[in-house]
A protein has these predicted regions:
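Short loop/turn and low-complexity linker motifs enriched in small/turn-promoting residues
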Residues: 19-162
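N-terminal hydrophobic targeting signals that begin at the initiator methionine
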Residues: 1-3, 22
Length: 162
């Protein structure tokens, strides 16, 4: 009899840990952002008093005009989980040049050789490389903090005068 009671108390304790729910609050900047938990939309931020089970979970945070964010979280049995997310805006940017024979590369991802290109870029620093005949001739960091048009000119050496 003692073994049965002992087993039941251990089972009840363990099942309480496994199946217990943890309080979840999610804040975002900006607000009114769609929050997906394990592929299910749980609403728009801020999220208050939602319940989440212990274990591994994936959050996906999405809002038009902002870079999407994915976040994996291992939830331990606890009293509460509070998450704060800051989404980076996406800006429409144009790159223009009158120079001929150049190839541009941004962040090792985007490449172009035309005189005008439009890109949607996440706010922050981006690496621009400029190639001519397969060799890097310029490299610079561009800070994107608003919609902007970037005009590229080759740096010309100063000529010596007599």
């Amino acid at each position: 009899m003692f073994k049965i009671i002992n087993f039941l108390s251990i089972f009840t304790f363990c099942s309480g840990i496994i199946f217990s729910q943890v309080k979840l609050d999610v804040n975002t900047i900006p607000t009114k952002v769609d929050i997906h938990l394990d592929g299910v939309n749980i609403g728009s931020s801020p999220i208050r008093n939602e319940r989440i089970s212990p274990g591994l979970h994936r959050f996906e945070i999405k809002k038009k005009g902002y870079a999407p964010l994915s976040y994996d979280l291992l939830v331990n049995p606890a009293q509460a989980v509070e998450l704060d997310f800051f989404l980076n805006p996406i800006y429409e940017c144009k790159f223009k040049t009158d120079e001929k024979g150049l190839v541009f590369e941004l962040n090792g991802e985007h490449r172009w050789d035309v005189d005008l290109v439009r890109l949607r870029l996440e706010a922050g620093d981006h690496l621009l490389r400029v190639f001519k005949i397969g060799e890097i001739i310029d490299e610079q960091i561009i800070n994107v903090d608003q919609p902007k048009k970037y005009n590229y000119f080759l740096k010309k050496p100063l000529s010596a005068s007599n």
